[in-house]
Design a protein with these regions (language model features):
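Nucleotide-binding/hydrolysis machinery
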Residues: 2-20, 57-62, 137-147, 155-301
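The feature captures the ABC ATPase H-loop/switch
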Residues: 113, 130-131, 153-156
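Protein kinase-like catalytic domain
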Residues: 30, 117, 128-129, 240-243
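Conserved post-Walker A coupling segment in P-loop NTPases
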Residues: 11, 18, 24-93, 101-117, ...
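AAA+/SF3 P-loop NTPase mechanochemical coupling elements
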Residues: 95-105, 117-123, 136-153, 165-166, ...
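Terminal-proximal interaction/regulatory segments of ATP-powered molecular machines
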Residues: 304-324
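CheY-like receiver
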Residues: 79-81, 90-93, 97, 117-120, ...
Length: 324
C-alpha cells in the first residue's frame, strides 16, 4: 500500500519499514468499525495515527475527541468520560455531557488507556460491549455510537498479570493491535527528523537551520533515544536557540545528549530492558515527567513492591498525587 499521501497529509516524517507498516495497518482497518489499540513508547508519535484512522473512516464527518486518560484525576475521570447529573457530587451545579456522549457518531481516542482506574475500566467495557453508558449520579442507561481507539506505552499483558488492567477489556480493545516503533528502531529516519525540526526552528527563530557534521550524524543515529521523537525535537529546539555556530559537531552534540556512553550501543544489541542502564531508565521517566507523570508513579509503586509506606517517607510526586 502506498502510504506516501497519508504521510504528506498528516506531516508524518520518515520512511522506515516499521513506521510505514503501522500507517498501512491503520489505513486498512480505518473503513471498519473495529476497536484499535496502538502501542508504543512515550514520545514515539502514537497520537497522529488515531487522526489518520478517523480521517479515512466512515465517521470522518463526525466528531473526533482525544482524551489523555493519564492527565485526568481519578476522582473526576468518570464524569469527564461519561458525564454527570446535577447535584451528583460537590461542585456539580448542572448536568454535563461526557466525552462519550459528545463523540456520538464519531471517534474517541483514549490516550494512556493503561492509566484508567479499574472502576472506570468496567464502565468502558460496557460501552464497548453494549454501546451503553450511565452518567455519574444517574440510573438511566444512554446509548452512544462511537468508535474507540486507544493508545498506551504500558506493557498491557504485564498490567493484566499484575491486576491493574482488566483482561476482558484488554482483548476487547486489542481487536486490531498497531505497534509504533521507537526512534532507535527507525535509524534511517533520525537525520530526516533532525532536518525537519531544524527547519521548523529556523523559521520560528529567524536564523539559519542547524546542520550536522558526518561524525555528528553517526552519533545521532547510534544514540538510543529514550525520549524518542519528543526528545529529538527538544534537542534541536535547545541547540537552535543556544548555539551560535550552525554546524553541530560531536563535541557540541555530546553536551546535549545525556549519558552518551550508556546510550551508544552496537547496532546488534538487543532492545530488552536488560540492555538499558539504570541511569538511562531514570532519565527516560524524568525526561517526560510533565506528560508521563503516571509512568513515574508506576515506577515508585514497583519500587515499594506493593508495601504501604508512611506518607512522610514517600517521594513527593507519589505522595501528593500531582496531575499535570
Amino acid at each position: 500500500m502506498n502510504v506516501q499521501p497519508i504521510k504528506q497529509r498528516f506531516g508524518i516524517i520518515g520512511s522506515s519499514p516499521g513506521l510505514d507498516r503501522a500507517i498501512s495497518n491503520v489505513a486498512q482497518v480505518a473503513p471498519t468499525d473495529l476497536s484499535v489499540l496502538i502501542q508504543g513508547e512515550s514520545g514515539s508519535g502514537k497520537e497522529v495515527l488515531p487522526q489518520v484512522l478517523h480521517a479515512y473512516s466512515a465517521r470522518k464527518h463526525g466528531p473526533y475527541i482525544a482524551v489523555n486518560c493519564g492527565a485526568i484525576p481519578e476522582g473526576t475521570i468518570d464524569s469527564e468520560l461519561f458525564g454527570h447529573e446535577k447535584g451528583s457530587f460537590t461542585g456539580a451545579h448542572e448536568a454535563r455531557k461526557g466525552y462519550f456522549e459528545v463523540a456520538n457518531g464519531g471517534t474517541i481516542f483514549l490516550d494512556e488507556v493503561g492509566e484508567l482506574p479499574l472502576t472506570t475500566q468496567v464502565r468502558l467495557l460496557r460501552v464497548l460491549e453494549t454501546g451503553e453508558f450511565i452518567r455519574v449520579g444517574s440510573s438511566k442507561a444512554q446509548k452512544t455510537n462511537v468508535r474507540v481507539v486507544a493508545a498506551t506505552n504500558v506493557q498491557m499483558l504485564q498490567a493484566v498479570a499484575k491486576g491493574t488492567f482488566r483482561e476482558d477489556l484488554y482483548y476487547r480493545l486489542n481487536t486490531v493491535p498497531i505497534h509504533v516503533p521507537p526512534l532507535r528502531e527507525r535509524k534511517e529516519d533520525i537525520h530526516l527528523l533532525f532536518r525537519f525540526f531544524a527547519q521548523e526552528a529556523a523559521a520560528r527563530y529567524k536564523a539559519p537551520p542547524l546542520t550536522l557534521t558526518e561524525e555528528a550524524q553517526r552519533m545521532l543515529i547510534a544514540y538510543r533515544w529514550p525520549g524518542n521523537i519528543r526528545q529529538l525535537r527538544n534537542l534541536v529546539e535547545q541547540m537552535s536557540v543556544i548555539e551560535q555556530t550552525r554546524e553541530v559537531d560531536v563535541k557540541t552534540l555530546r553536551d546535549y545528549l545525556p549519558e552518551e556512553s550508556t546510550a551508544l550501543v552496537p547496532a546488534s544489541a538487543g532492545g530488552g530492558i536488560e540492555s538499558i542502564s539504570e541511569r538511562e531508565l531514570i532519565y527516560k521517566f524524568l525526561y517526560d515527567m510533565k506528560s508521563d507523570l503516571n509512568a513515574l508513579k508506576e515506577q515508585v509503586r514497583s519500587l515499594v513492591a506493593g508495601q504501604p509506606m508512611p506518607a512522610a517517607t514517600m517521594p513527593p510526586v507519589y505522595r501528593e498525587e500531582l496531575y499535570i
